[in-house]
Amino acid sequence: MPQLVPFFFVNQVVYAFVILTVLIYAFTKFILPKFVRIFISRIYINKL
């Protein structure tokens, strides 16, 4: 069973941590500001 090998567990943890940090960075830098801009423009359009 590969789950009992310590290197397998460390490998899984490291890859999960790296993928999570990359996803969080991508969301905060690229994806979420677009949604914020869309919502702000909707608010301004509705106030007209």
Swiss-Prot record:
InterPro entries in alphabetical order: ATP_synth_su8_fun
Pfam families: Fun_ATP-synt_8
Keyword Ribosomal protein included in the entry's annotation: no
Transmembrane segments: 4-24
Source species, domain of life: Eukaryota
Lipid bilayer topology: Single-pass membrane protein
Any one of the GO CC terms: mitochondrial membrane
Keyword field: ATP synthesis, CF(0), Hydrogen ion transport, Ion transport, Membrane, Mitochondrion, Transmembrane, Transmembrane helix, Transport
Molecular function GO labels: proton-transporting ATP synthase activity, rotational mechanism
Localization (cell): Mitochondrion membrane
Main location class: mitochondrion
Record text on subunit structure and interactions: F-type ATPases have 2 components, CF(1) - the catalytic core - and CF(0) - the membrane proton channel.
Primary role: Mitochondrial membrane ATP synthase (F(1)F(0) ATP synthase or Complex V) produces ATP from ADP in the presence of a proton gradient across the membrane which is generated by electron transport complexes of the respiratory chain. F-type ATPases consist of two structural domains, F(1) - containing the extramembraneous catalytic core and F(0) - containing the membrane proton channel, linked together by a central stalk and a peripheral stalk. During catalysis, ATP synthesis in the catalytic domain of F(1) is coupled via a rotary mechanism of the central stalk subunits to proton translocation.
Similarity annotation: Belongs to the ATPase protein 8 family.
Protein name from the UniProt record: ATP synthase protein 8
The species this protein was found in: Aspergillus amstelodami
Lineage, opening ranks: Eukaryota, Fungi, Dikarya, Ascomycota, Pezizomycotina
